[in-house]
């Protein structure tokens, strides 16, 4: 028997980057978790169905975080005076080594999943660690919480500390075993192949991971062109390749299956061509790029090439889980790039940044991040009445105000694929 859900409230979403759709006191109808109608009135065929009325609250799509490191959750706000490579050595690698203990993983991942829920991140693309058991713990907790995610067991077999490095063949064996075990988590929580980045993966490992991605038909995530030191390092490790991007491409880690690359700040025009050709998604991580002094990604330039773009918190290079704040930071960074670097590329608009935080990143999951017909119903219910303002505001103004000055306390309900997601901690 089909399950029908009807939500009523002030609806806002972005079917395209340039356009907000706002429907005052409108209706969203979903059947078996998929939107079949979104409009001003209830079609006659559904007139007898029960309506969940959220009154004057805002109804927006759930947020999608396209890049975060779950094991780095306890490192938020630490080492923000360092650049990428020293930061990894000082803070990241020692913390990730602790996840050899599944009990420690359960403790930290439980807090991380709770924070995703609290901030309205209904879908995410996550790095775990090299430890397959702990990565399975993360997947289990996400499944139990009712949140959707791609989760990766990290691979790294070179240029890594002795306490956080794998043997090449064992890394591939562990990854295959982890992929097989991941099947138990169902449609909302899925595996993603995760070479940390080129400097930490030998060619043998990268080739093997590419084969596993194709064999299991699972996507790939990694980092690309985040920091000048990293780029120079890759060039010294792979002089046979014309650029950083093509190292991934030549090892069949880009384009064969859906791929998302975090950062992509310092790409050459040739590399941008490759990204467009392979339709590799960019995860733009504005807080991290500022905190680690990495640079400002040329987002408008990438948009003009029709490269898919989502937003990432990049915990813990980024220090804030809230995608509402990540998207406003993306707008702010684009303004700085426009003012200080290149006035040929206009700053991001609110609708463009909101699109990236919802439908833009949601495309990696399929039809997600919008209330258009055929999309999974992921939604947040926002009660903004406690934000003082005696003036009458449009729905778009109310949304903008909440994104900038509101917080998770205003999110009163969360839906994933048509189901209410209760507080994981009860």
Segments and roles (model prediction):
Residues 76-147, 171-185:
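Alpha-helical scaffold segments that flank or form the walls of functional sites
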Residues 133-264:
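Metal-coordinating catalytic core of metallo-dependent amide/deamination hydrolases
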Residues 1-46, 57:
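N-terminal metal-binding scaffold of metallo-dependent hydrolase/deaminase domains
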Residues 250-256, 300-388:
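His/Asp/Glu-enriched, well-ordered alpha-helical/loop segment
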Residues 74-105, 153, 158-168, 227-256, ...:
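Active-site gating loops and adjacent loop-to-helix segments of metal-dependent hydrolytic enzymes
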Residues 16, 376-426:
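C-terminal cap of metal-dependent C-N hydrolases
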Residues 10, 28, 33, 56, ...:
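Divalent metal-coordination and catalytic microenvironments
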């Amino acid at each position: 028997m089909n399950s029908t859900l009807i939500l009523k409230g002030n609806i806002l979403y972005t079917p395209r980057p340039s356009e907000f759709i706002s429907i005052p006191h409108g209706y969203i109808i979903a059947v078996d978790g998929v939107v079949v109608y979104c409009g001003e009135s209830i079609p006659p065929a559904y007139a007898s169905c029960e309506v969940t009325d959220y009154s004057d609250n805002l109804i927006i799509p759930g947020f999608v975080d396209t890049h975060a490191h779950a094991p780095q959750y306890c490192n938020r706000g630490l080492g923000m005076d360092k650049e990428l490579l020293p930061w990894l050595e000082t803070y990241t690698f020692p913390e990730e080594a602790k996840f050899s203990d599944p009990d420690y993983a359960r403790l930290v991942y439980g807090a991380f999943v709770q924070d995703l829920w609290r901030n309205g991140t209904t879908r995410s693309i996550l790095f775990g660690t090299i430890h397959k058991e702990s990565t399975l713990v993360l997947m289990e907790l996400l499944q139990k919480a009712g949140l959707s995610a791609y989760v990766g067991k990290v691979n790294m077999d070179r240029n890594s500390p002795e306490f956080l490095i794998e043997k090449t063949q064992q890394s591939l064996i562990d990854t295959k075993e982890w992929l097989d075990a991941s099947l138990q988590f169902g449609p909302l929580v899925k595996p993603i192949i995760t070479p940390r980045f080129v400097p930490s993966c030998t060619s043998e490992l990268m080739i093997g991971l590419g084969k596993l991605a194709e064999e299991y038909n699972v996507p790939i995530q990694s980092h690309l062109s985040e920091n000048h030191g990293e780029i120079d390092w890759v060039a010294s490790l792979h002089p046979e390749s014309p650029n950083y991007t093509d190292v991934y491409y030549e090892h069949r880690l880009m384009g064969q299956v859906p791929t998302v690359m975090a950062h992509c700040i310092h790409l050459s025009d040739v590399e941008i061509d490759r990204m467009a050709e392979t339709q590799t998604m960019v995860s733009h991580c504005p807080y991290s790029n500022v905190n680690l002094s990495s640079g400002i990604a040329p987002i408008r330039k990438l948009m003009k090439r029709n490269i898919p773009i989502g937003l990432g918190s990049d915990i813990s290079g980024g220090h804030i889980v809230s995608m509402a704040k990540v998207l406003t930071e993306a707008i702010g960074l684009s303004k700085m790039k426009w003012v200080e670097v290149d006035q040929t590329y206009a700053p991001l608009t609110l609708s463009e940044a909101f699109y990236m935080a919802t439908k833009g990143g949601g495309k990696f999951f399929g039809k997600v991040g919008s209330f258009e017909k055929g999309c999974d119903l992921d939604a947040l219910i926002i009660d903004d009445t406690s934000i003082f303002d005696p003036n009458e505001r449009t729905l778009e103004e109310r949304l903008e105000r909440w994104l900038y000055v509101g917080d998770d306390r205003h999110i009163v309900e969360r839906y994933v694929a048509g189901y209410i997601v209760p507080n994981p901690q009860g």
